[in-house]
């Protein structure tokens, strides 16, 4: 079931990326990334509250961010997240 949800989220992300044209304006390239809107920490929980084999120490230390433009170095895309009507990439390390 989790695999189906993850695959459908990836398909939706692919459609979203293809639907939105990439706009590279001078304003976007000159401004530095500012924390806040782009870098939002997300709490990630795996398994049930009583605990499961998925809740190992390495998974509890997982830190994820919702990012607009893609994952940073040492992060990998782990799905998508939504804020309002906008869809972001869920980048975890």
Swiss-Prot record:
It is found in: Secreted. It holds the Pfam family Defensin_propep. Residues 23-56 are annotated as: Disordered. Paneth cells of the small bowel. Residues 20-58 form a propeptide. Disulfide bonds join 64-92, 66-81, 71-91. Residues 1-19 form the signal peptide. PROSITE patterns: DEFENSIN. SMART domains: Defensin_propep (SM01418), DEFSN (SM00048). InterPro entries: Alpha-defensin (IPR016327), Alpha-defensin_C (IPR006081), Alpha-defensin_N (IPR002366), Beta/alpha-defensin_C (IPR006080). The keyword Transferase does not apply. Keywords: Antibiotic, Antimicrobial, Defensin, Disulfide bond, Secreted, Signal. One of its GO terms (biological process) is defense response to bacterium. Belongs to the alpha-defensin family. This is Alpha-defensin 9. The lineage of its organism: Eukaryota, Metazoa, Chordata, Craniata, Vertebrata.
């Amino acid at each position: 079931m989790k695999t189906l949800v993850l695959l459908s989220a990836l398909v939706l992300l692919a459609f979203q990326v293809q639907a939105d044209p990439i706009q590279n304006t001078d304003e976007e390239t000159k401004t530095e990334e500012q924390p806040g809107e782009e870098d939002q920490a997300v709490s990630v929980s795996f398994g049930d509250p009583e605990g499961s084999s998925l809740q190992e120490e390495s998974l509890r230390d997982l830190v994820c961010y919702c990012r607009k433009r893609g994952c940073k170095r040492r992060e990998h895309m782990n799905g998508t997240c939504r804020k309002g009507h906008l869809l972001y990439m869920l980048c975890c390390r």
